[in-house]
């Protein structure tokens, strides 16, 4: 089983005193040495240990840029800004450690152990027959994999919204999607976000196959934490440890890996059939702490960006329309370059961008739809092709990739079978009604007749002893105060509910939320992702600081049972 090990911790004072460029540290308890490289707000870290023969690195006095260190044994040089050895050039890459902030402005250096768990029991790839392994794209992050005589499905979101009512499917799934799901031998669900764990989809599946085997990683917050409340009857959910091969049959196995070093929520997966690896990093920011298998047969990952309320839902101060547009453009470009570099580094035979095909299609979210520009998968694939020889696939719903054909000859016209001419690719209607009326049913609930629910809810939530005052305002569709709605302050320092802001110095945040969504979230004890990632809030803050502990608590750490 894979575990995360803390190698070094720095106090808030030591972290604040990190200088630009190279910093050397020693863990006084273990005697082990480490290097931290700081460039503006970005930190990189590695062991102070030369890969050649284990020598110690010291400052390289010939380096005027302050980026490289020199080994005391044979003068090998490492550029710590890229983690690549520059003398001799093209020799090694240094293994990066994960830098984690601890919430109090200190930091940890962490290593996953074992770092490359897929190397246990390695298998030599065997030749695949044509048609033996087929991958069919259904929609968003949902793939249907035929692997010999087994079928596996990733992240089925085929109907309904995600994040309350903020996200809707961009692509029209193939009409036989439910039959495909019912035929699956196993389903992998990467994490609890509703564009991957879709209860409306699973409800339809469970009516036909309640015992379908579903596999999830052993995350800190269980993926299916809300199953009982959802009313969906699924009886075969399997929670598996990270970094351990799960054998399906003699040819097929899979391994679930964590994101970064925090098994809080996100996971990714390696599926291996007859020695050929399919790597799906899903939404992971730093899958497996940045260590991934190279030369996989097929790699797929998210690419689009825009999966957050920031900055579209913010106003005041610097948040002008011009600033937002520039920020979004720059962030999307950074993400595009990062994904292209990752593909270049990992050198899969084939790469497929997916898990970004959503749209803010409800008319009330027109502003978000127009502002929240996503990356174009074709643009990413063109960037990849410019940098390396990886074959790329921009999937259309119902399109099928034949892995055996593509590995043998990427130019084979039968390698990717597109959906028939005239197949509907993009959705142009969504069944808003039933989903919105479910949310709206919470508005008139008797628990909201008296303001006593406010204290009860935030006491249940359990976040306190933090200097932050939040004003919560219930609103209509257009974020204007809801007639007869609640407008109140919460002081999280002592968890009080004052009539006006306290006189002490305090950070302040104002959160306007659509009344149907916020009351539904409160009543059912749901996570605030529905509000924030679902674009159901408008925010102002003073000063302009991201309160990680506050948001992390309400997005991941709320109690598992409703108030």
From Swiss-Prot:
- On whether Electron transport is a keyword of this UniProt record, the answer is yes
PANTHER family documented for this protein: CYTIDINE MONOPHOSPHATE-N-ACETYLNEURAMINIC ACID HYDROXYLASE (PTHR46522), INACTIVE CYTIDINE MONOPHOSPHATE-N-ACETYLNEURAMINIC ACID HYDROXYLASE (PTHR46522:SF1)
Q: Which GO terms describe its molecular function?
A: 2 iron, 2 sulfur cluster binding; CMP-N-acetylneuraminate monooxygenase activity; metal ion binding
The protein depicted here goes by the name Cytidine monophosphate-N-acetylneuraminic acid hydroxylase
Q: What is one process in the GO biological process aspect for this record?
A: CMP-N-acetylneuraminate metabolic process
The gene designation is CMAH
Look up the EC number in the record and give it: 1.14.18.2
* Highest rank taxon of the organism: Eukaryota
Keywords, alphabetical: 2Fe-2S, Cytoplasm, Electron transport, Iron, Iron-sulfur, Metal-binding, Oxidoreductase, Transport
Q: What does the entry's cofactor note say about binding and number?
A: Binds 1 [2Fe-2S] cluster per subunit.
Required cofactor(s): [2Fe-2S] cluster
């Amino acid at each position: 089983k894979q575990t995360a090990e803390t190698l070094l911790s720095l106090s808030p004072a030591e972290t604040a005193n990190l200088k630009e460029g190279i910093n050397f540290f020693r863990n006084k308890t273990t005697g082990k040495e480490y290097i931290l490289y700081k460039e503006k707000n970005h930190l990189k870290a590695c062991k102070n240990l030369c890969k050649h023969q284990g020598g110690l690195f010291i400052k390289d006095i010939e380096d005027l840029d302050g980026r490289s260190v020199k080994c005391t044994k044979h003068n090998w040089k490492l550029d710590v800004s890229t983690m690549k050895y520059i003398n001799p050039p093209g020799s090694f890459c240094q293994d990066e450690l994960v830098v984690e902030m601890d919430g109090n402005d200190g930091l940890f250096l962490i290593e996953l152990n074992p770092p490359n768990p897929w190397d246990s029991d390695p298998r030599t790839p065997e030749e695949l027959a044509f048609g033996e392994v087929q991958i069919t794209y259904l929609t968003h992050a949902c793939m249907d994999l035929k692997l010999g005589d087994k079928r596996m499905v990733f992240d089925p979101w085929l109907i309904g919204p995600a994040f309350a009512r903020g996200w809707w499917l961009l692509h029209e799934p193939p009409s036989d999607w439910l039959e495909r799901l019912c035929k699956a031998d196993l389903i992998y669900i990467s994490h609890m976000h509703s564009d991957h764990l879709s209860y409306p989809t699973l409800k339809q599946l469970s009516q036909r196959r309640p015992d379908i085997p579903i596999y999830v990683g052993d995350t800190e917050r269980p993926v299916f934490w809300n199953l009982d409340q959802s009313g969906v009857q699924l009886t075969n959910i399997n929670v598996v440890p990270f970094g351990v091969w799960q054998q399906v049959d003699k040819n097929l196995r899979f391994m679930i890996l964590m994101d970064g070093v925090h098994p809080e929520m996100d996971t990714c997966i390696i599926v291996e059939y007859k020695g050929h690896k399919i790597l799906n990093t899903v939404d992971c920011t730093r899958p497996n702490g940045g260590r991934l298998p190279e030369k996989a047969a097929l790699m797929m990952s998210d690419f689009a960006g825009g999966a957050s309320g920031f900055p579209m839902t913010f106003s005041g101060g610097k948040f002008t329309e011009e600033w937002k547009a520039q920020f979004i453009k720059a962030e999307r470009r950074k993400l595009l370059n990062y994904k292209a570099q990752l593909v270049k580094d990992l050198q899969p035979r084939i790469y497929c961008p997916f898990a970004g095909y959503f749209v803010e299609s409800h008319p009330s979210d027109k502003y978000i739809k127009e502002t929240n520009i996503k990356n174009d998968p074709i643009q990413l694939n063109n960037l990849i092709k410019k940098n390396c020889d990886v074959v790329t696939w921009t999937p259309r719903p119902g399109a099928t990739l034949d892995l055996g054909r593509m590995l043998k000859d990427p130019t084979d016209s039968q390698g990717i079978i597109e959906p028939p001419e005239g197949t509907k690719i993009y959705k142009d209607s969504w069944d808003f009604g039933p989903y919105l009326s479910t949310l709206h049913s919470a508005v008139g609930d008797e628990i909201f007749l008296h303001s006593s629910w406010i204290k009860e809810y935030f006491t249940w939530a359990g976040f306190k002893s933090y200097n932050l005052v939040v004003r919560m305002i219930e609103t209509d569709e257009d974020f204007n105060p809801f007639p007869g709605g609640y407008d109140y302050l919460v002081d999280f320092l002592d968890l009080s509910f004052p009539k006006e802001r306290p006189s002490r110095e305090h950070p302040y945040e104002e959160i306007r939320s659509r009344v149907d969504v916020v009351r539904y979230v409160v009543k059912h004890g749901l996570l605030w992702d529905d509000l924030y990632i679902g674009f159901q809030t408008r925010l102002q803050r003073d000063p302009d600081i991201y309160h990680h502990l506050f948001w992390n608590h309400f997005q991941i750490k709320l109690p598992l049972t409703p108030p």
